[in-house]
Amino acid sequence: MQLKNFYPKMSVLGIATVMALTACGDENTQALFANNPVPGAENQVPVSSSDMSPTSSDAVIDPTSSSAAVVDPSTLPAEGPITMPEGLGTLVDDFEDGDNLSKIGDYWYTYNDNDNGGASIITTPLNEEENIIPGRVNNGSNYALQVNYTLDRGDYEYDPYVGWGVQVAPDEANGHFGGLTYWYKGGAHEVHIEITDVEDYDVHLAKFPASRTWKQAVVRFKDLVQGGWGKEIPFDAKHIMAISFQAKGNKSKLVTDSLFIDNIYLQDSSEVEKDQPDMEIKDPVIPVVEFTEAEITVTNPLQEKAMKYLNKGVNFTNWLENADGKFKSFELGESDVKILADNGFKSLRLPIDLDLYATNRDAFIAGTDTELKFDDDTLFLVLDSFVEWTAKYNMSFVIDYHEYDNSYNTTSAKDPNYIKMMAETWKHVAAHYAESPREDLFFELLNEPDMSDGKVTAATWTTAAQAMIDAIRTVDTKHTILFGDAQWYSITLLAKRTPFTDDNIIYVIHTYEPFAFTHQGGSWTDYATIHDIPFPYDPAKWSTVSGDFGVNKSTKSYVKTNIKNYYKTGSKEAILEQILKAKKWAATNNVPVIINEFGALNLRSTAESRLNYLTAMREICDTLQIPWTHWGYTGNFSVIENGKLIEGLDKALGVGSK
């Protein structure tokens, strides 16, 4: 990370805090200033931290135009007026002095991704000392901090970024702060409230969408979440060391935009809006699920094969499927396979982005190369090793073509050369194993096509899938292929599908329902702030206040709705009702169906609830004779910790040491 204009910490914030506490002792006499806008600001509606992805900051849009015309990022904001913060808190900066020094006595600094290989830059004109400085505005004040920027990934592995912030002197007196407010206009961004306790850059943050009119951002510290890649640390306002803003881009495109920030104010806890009752505690609504044995019976011999080889499986997660996941070393290896086998698991699914090993992939897609070439030494070092180890420990093996970079998407899905690249990749892998005598080796075409967006249609995905099936069958007619539908291996889409004519295909679904339970606390989801949702739904553990479960003003409406309706979805029977649709389709078409992803994050739920959920899933699969593979081995969905099966999973999943 490249830092500019980084000055020593100063303790003015601590002094200002003490003065505020001394002068204003009655914490109940001050209302939240955001609820008392100045005259003329009636249409300036406060927004709270949004859990939307801050991926691409939009190109700058003229707010007066109905078209998406790009305008000069330095265009003077004309809306106003905005409110001036007053109360028991502390003004961080209103920028009215027009210089680089904040009201808390420290200077504004900037940073970017250049030291990590990125090419992002801040393009705002600097002063003579090369410091970022406020720009003129017409929003009821004279100045706001103006940052123009270009987000360019360059050679950086992840999303490009630029940022700017101000240091804060950690102080015990700062513990009375409960939130932050500021006004902004411009691109999507994150606000980072950095504390000294975090040592791995997994900072506490909130996300806000782009706005082409002035909006007030309201951040309650109780709603902050961490990025999710580092150690979880409780937020403590006494340890605040910096307040910064970050514009984050997209790996796939160049973004030019701007952001104006004004009137940054640390709120006293008494000024922070409190949660209010907004739900009812209802009795659970349990669906009645009925079916006959005939409705779920599959006589196809592949059903027996699936139950024999693909039941009680586990995914190796967060490794070779990553965008930067090309093999470097065996982060997971033979000892891990042995641990799984010793604990009663029968199948290993290896997510791996196969096309990362095509050495001329881009040239082939561009049409300049007509033959796809591979780094076979690396690719088959990995695959052959796991073929050997799984055979040694009597586990089946699934090669799962799995793309976290979302390179198969609505654009590439229409590119014949891209489809040919995927087909040739599978042909290459299948040819390598064509003579393998193992009948428990499986080829999974592509995990959750268009994984990030889910916008590729079933028909479009069928075209690509058929091309891969045909390519595999030119070299290998023996090994079974696994196919899942578009939209994240959708049950709904599969239930509408006509099976392929190839009679050696097993069909796959994924399910993480109820999502409000399984993904609570997931930093990459719209449920990032959600916590303590129980499974199953229990009125005795419910509340009339959705805020007790982490719902806040930024929580998306569909998430709020899902939580309010959880009394209808938080049961084993509700899950069964959905999975049964896939099983009935499978029985009707006499083809097997499996589940090779399900699981629950261990971030914000109790161990008891997770065991209840896993027990329900295993019982459903046993009842419907559906083989299952859990996501995943380690990490936040783990079944193994410190080399041992997590307590209670032996009974929940019907596994365990022999």
UniProtKB/Swiss-Prot annotation:
Enzyme class per UniProt: hydrolase
Localization per Swiss-Prot or TrEMBL: Membrane
Keyword Lipoprotein (UniProt): yes
Pfam families linked to this entry: Cellulase
Membrane disposition: Lipid-anchor
Domain called CBM11: residue spans: 87-277
A GO molecular-function annotation: beta-glucosidase activity
Compositional bias (Low complexity): 45-58
Residues the record marks as active site: 448, 597
Covalent lipid adducts (S-diacylglycerol cysteine), residues: 24
Major place of residence: membrane
Gene3D superfamilies attached to this UniProt entry: Glycosidases
UniProt xrefs under SUPFAM superfamilies: (Trans)glycosidases, Galactose-binding domain-like
Segment forming the signal sequence: 1-23
Protein name per UniProt: Endoglucanase 3
Gene of this entry: cel-3
